[in-house]
Swiss-Prot record:
The replicase large subunit is an RNA-dependent RNA polymerase active in viral RNA replication. Readthrough of the terminator codon UAG occurs between codons for Gln-1103 and Gln-1105. This is Replicase large subunit. Residues 72-280 form the Alphavirus-like MT domain. Keywords: ATP-binding, Helicase, Host-virus interaction, Hydrolase, Inhibition of host innate immune response by virus, Nucleotide-binding, Nucleotidyltransferase, RNA suppression of termination, RNA-directed RNA polymerase, Suppressor of RNA silencing, Transferase, Viral immunoevasion, Viral RNA replication. The keyword Nucleotidyltransferase applies. It comes from the Viruses.
Amino acid sequence: MAQFQQTVNMQTLQAAAGRNSLVNDLASRRVYDNAVEELNARSRRPKVHFSKSVSTEQTLLASNAYPEFEISFTHTQQAVHSLAGGLRTLELEYLMMQVPFGSLTYDIGGNFAAHLFKGRDYVHCCMPNLDVRDIARHEGHKEAIFSYLSRLDRQRRPVPEYQRAAFHNYAENPHFVHCDRPFQQCELSTVNRWDTYAIALHSIYDIPADEFGAALLRKNVKICYAAFHFHENMLLDCDSVTLEDIGATFQRAGDKLNFFFHNESTLNYTHSFSNIIKYVCKTFFPASQRYVYHKEFLVTRVNTWYCKFTRVDTFTLFRGVYKTSVDSEEFYKAMDDAWEYKKTLAMLNSERTIFKDSAAINFWFPKVRDMVIIPLFDASITTGRMSRREVLVNKDFVYTVLNHIKTYQAKALTYANVLSFVESIRSRVIINGVTARSEWDTDKAILGPLAMTFFLVTKLSHVQDEIVLKKFQKFDATAKELIWSSLCDALKGVIPSVKETLARGGFVKLAEESLEIKIPELYCTFTDRLVLEYKRTEEFQSCDLSKPLEESEKYYNALSELSVLENLGSFDLDAFKELCQKKNVDPDVAAKVVVAIMNSELTLPFKKPTEEEVAEALSGEVVQDEGLRLSNKAPFPCVSNLKEGLVPACGLCPNGANFDRVDMDISEFHLKSVDAVKKGAMMSAVYTGKIKVQQMKNYVDYLSASLSATVSNLCKVLRDVHGVDPESQEKSGVWDVRRGRWLLKPNAKCHAWGVAEDANHKLVIVLLNWDEGKPVCDETWFRLAVSSDSLVYSDMGKLKTLTSCCRDGEPPEPTAKLVLVDGVPGCGKTKEILEKVNFSEDLVLVPGKEASKMIIRRANQAGITRADKDNVRTVDSFLMHPPKRVFKRLFIDEGLMLHTGCVNFLMLLSHCDVAYVYVDTQQIPFICRVANFPYPAHFAKLVVDEKEDRRVTLRCPADVTYFLNQKYDGSVLCTSSVERSVSAEVVRGKGALNPITLPLEGKILTFTQADKFELLDKGYKDVNTVHEVQGETYEKTAIVRLTATPLEIISRASPHVLVALTRHTTRCKYYTVVLDPMVNVISELGKLSNFLLEMYKVESGTQXQLQIDTVFKGTNLFVPTPKSGDWRDMQFYYDTLLPGNSTILNEFDAVTMNLRDISLNVKDCRIDFSKSVQVPKERPVFMKPKLRTAAEMPRTAGLLENLVAMIKRNMNAPDLTGTIDIEDTASLVVEKFWDAYVVKEFSGTDGMAMTRESFSRWLSKQESSTVGQLADFNFVDLPAVDEYKHMIKSQPKQKLDLSIQDEYPALQTIVYHSKKINAIFGPMFSELTRMLLETIDTSKFLFYTRKTPTQIEEFFSDLDSSQAMEILELDISKYDKSQNEFHCAVEYKIWEKLGIDDWLAEVWRQGHRKTTLKDYTAGIKTCLWYQRKSGDVTTFIGNTIIIAACLSSMIPMDKVIKAAFCGDDSLIYIPKGLDLPDIQAGANLTWNFEAKLFRKKYGYFCGRYVIHHDRGAIVYYDPLKLISKLGCKHIRDEVHLEELRRSLCDVTSNLNNCAYFSQLDEAVAEVHKTAVGGAFVYCSIIKYLSDKRLFKDLFFV
């Protein structure tokens, strides 16, 4: 082939050289055709427009550097660093040429405008604002786009076709086009985990090299192409390196590397030198345990280096690759370091392989070929100091000079001669009149210092040779003097102070009696320097083991101290060590404290023994509290002036104040400062002494905390109330003393005490008397606050009594013998007390007044008065007014309902010899009603001397006795002749309960206060909760449950169920609206045989059932869902899960409600009945669905509809809260919230910055009608912030239960501000929300706001199904209207931590305290206190914050695996077996929530099932909810129908994967007990949603 081509060429040349014109023409034609083909090929190159004005040389430089492009130079724009700026375009296009067209590409730090102009709709730019210059650059990009679009608009031209997709993305989905986060934190997700690509144009400088690989892998980047500026001289000890081609300079100062352009006033760029060196020197960038990114250099063009990073799967490496051989030469070199560092460092240094190939170095660094690094020395005559620097010099030049001057004689070897020779071989020479250029192009500026280096090296080499020759000669002078003499003679006149100069330069080393001459290394190659530079950045630091050994010794001694514990194997030693290290606590002291705590010799007041609680108690010393001396000199008409005396300032502490044992009066609290009461509450103390004494101290602190919380709330009421509201009926009240009227009217009168504000605005506690319903006040008082908690002196009196019997803050330990009588319900505990008690010398104490009256009545029923108010008393009365007598025996009924410290005080104050405490260990125990007060578990156990059991019930029938045997140890017997007494009835909704149609027989009991109040509103009488009637007996009882959602207190293990089933003697019937565990219990009791019931009159053992749990193991597969089935499959599935719902004929329910008489329980409101008659309107025609569901027709707003909705959503709010200190408790909750969810690095905030951009962002999301409402708003003054508008939604919300069969569902309401208010506070809270979401630890917690549904699946995708875990769902009914003053306080404190403006925050707070609702459509006006407004700007994020704060206050969030929150929905994954508090009680008493806690196998969040499996999780939309939507009755036309289909397709995309349908069936079965396997239904759903025609068949006109 080669011979043939050569022949053709020769023939062509011969033809061209001949005279034949035809042949010549053919040759010319051939040359012309070749030129045309070449030019056509060049014209097909990508075209790049180079508008910068550059010189001719720079034009040629750019054209030669990038032959892949056809560059057109127009020279129409003058700019700074024109060449570098123009090359950026070429560099970007060159990088994009490497990426496959259409593949998703991340442009790290890129220019999104350039991609839009090119029509690239597949590029996402990560543009973080790392400094102000970045912000300005990004604004310039936006301005360029705006100018381009404006020009098209002026010319009335559309956007070109190739740009439309990109500009459409920019307009509709700007987050896909660009984001303001660093690449490592970019939130853009890829579809189906396809491979992506990335480019980095001059942006990897600011990405840490150690994070680069992991960041690429997170985005599933296959190849990343990068370009950056670099120069070989940067690896030398050079302070400055110039990039001549682009006119820029690198300047190095330590690790700081500055980059700037010459002769320009532009900002400098600063980078990390060590980080850039890693990118240059490292080859592998680890991304995970499996993947690494391998770096390869591509090409170098105009001072820009190109490289690519390729993802490599190390699992595919041949196993022989992993053998690591040791370089013996490098190992011996590293042995010197092994003496200073660890031996492993020597092994690491010996195994380094990077850049060992010099050919590769020379290829990629061509300028360093045959170059060596020479040190240069500069000396100062004035200071005597010497500096050192390095340069690259040709290797041949160095040896030529050294070999020549080595031949000089000693006299001829001078610096001048060496410099002369160096200059001569560097300069031009003239040979025969012709100038010849020197062979070596060495910089003339360094010839002088370079000659000095050659001179010094040669001189020292001669001196070394002389010493070797004279080594065995004898001289009078010492060797040291001889050497110094030789050195001084050799260098005389060259450098002053030769000795100091040589020593400073490292040429000689001095010792006291020795001298060492060391010739420095003449040079090192660039390869060696590159390896050294890389090693320098990777060397390990030394480690001092002395301190760790000392700490280990301390921990060993501490472990010896802990060895006395019984369960040492379960003791967490790692947590103990972390505690001591984090809190700087001595391990030995901490071990002794732990042993004392475990042995109950010492108690710390915490709920959980966390390291923070233990460290807080160990670090600080308890300060002795001083007594508060009172002197009342102010006139007081009803309470006599007080004498001076001492009263306690707070609860007990180990070193408390001294109190004399005197009979103090409660009036000593009069005019006591509120600060004296508040300062001692919730203090951190260490309880010491015996366990009884510790319990007594805890009880006194409990009373102090309760009093402090009440006083604090009264102070808050005084601060908050400003205007007059005489119509309100609240728990708290404020009396204006000077005007003689209520500013805030309480719902009760005749309070015992309150908090008054005097003329000096000082707050004091005052005791009250009343005159005709008005408090008698001092003339110096300004205002007075009272509340329902200040109706009696209970806490004051008890606190006074208990502190009076203490000496030096230590209560005496009671010496009485304590006998615990544990009896089953109905065992005759009260009867036994009456039989054993001697009323002349014994004392009987009971918890309540009713029980006291009952015992007195039964004791005196024979006609002889034995019991009276002196020997049968309530516990509170006894503690407030202890008698001055001694009792022989003490009988306490229902003792477990009391604080254990209270029981000990009762024994102490009664001076009894024996105390009988009658309890039921399985019934409701003492509930701590002060939020966040520490009541450790071991304090809840009474210290008893004897225990007696009563296992024969005189009250309970035989079937209930069977249930009791499952609860108590031992056999429970009964004496009742009644065998069957319990029954249950499931009613069709709460509306079926009515005193007329369904009268209830016997005593009516409920589980919740809400159900109790609702029954009272319906007209039922004599209704109490189960907790209120504990200890009572009734012949017949009726237990009612109106709450349809599950309640945690209704379970087999709940003491509430036990109490409820054991109050009757003959009959008990349970009415419920839903199947629950209590129905199952009653059903089981009804199935018992008569023979089995008779057995409980004799001893019988308890049988247990062996259960086997199933374990599911799945695989992460994608199996397409087959499109099969019929719409009747969906109908069958709906009817199976919700039987009866499809048969409801509710089309005319709204008409029936408007026509028939109706009775509504309405709170105070104003109604305009002129709005009751609706204006006739033409009713629209809607399409009818084939699927029959419980969906209703759209309703029309009117008086009745709106009023019913308002009653349901806003009135009759629950009131379950116990006694809490709102301010202190809110602060504690917020601190827990912050510690639980906020990343520690972002826990500090710089304050909120309201800018024009934040308002513009809010305004851009508003509709045009909203903007029009702001046209006449001047923003000078605020409208009324406490006024809201009220409206309803036309479509009722479908419930996935059976309530629709008996109830008329109320519509959802929207309570909203005017747009003018939203324009002020909307941007502010939007910015605060953004700040909060940025600080949340998103690896563990999901706040589902400002996110897409697919991000739910991404969040749960890293769940480990092999880990044993529990799934908790907290469902709260009446969530919005249950939120009261405490919830607002928590939310405001969170906004304060984020930096909200104080003035606006106060305006917002006052606007949400007491609010007015106006419904102009229905003519309704009412007033609400607090509550969550459904249309407020903070509704969604506020609800999300509250549910998250509620859970963080009760659940240890540091142990949580995953948690998600959205409005009132929550989903928490916790390790299995985690010890949790009573969430039901906490939610009721502290948060006023009717909470239901679900424990499930699969999670349910925002209408979606979260199915976790062995490789992650998949989220399925609730199929039953989807079918319910397919039966909707508000579709207007086919366009509306198509919109519905598309929206359903979006939310149900995961149903196309049928790999996990079996787990989905299990999840559905957890919620709906009648569920069947639904795979056939899911296939049918996909079939109809994916086909427009089939979907239209589901509806007809």
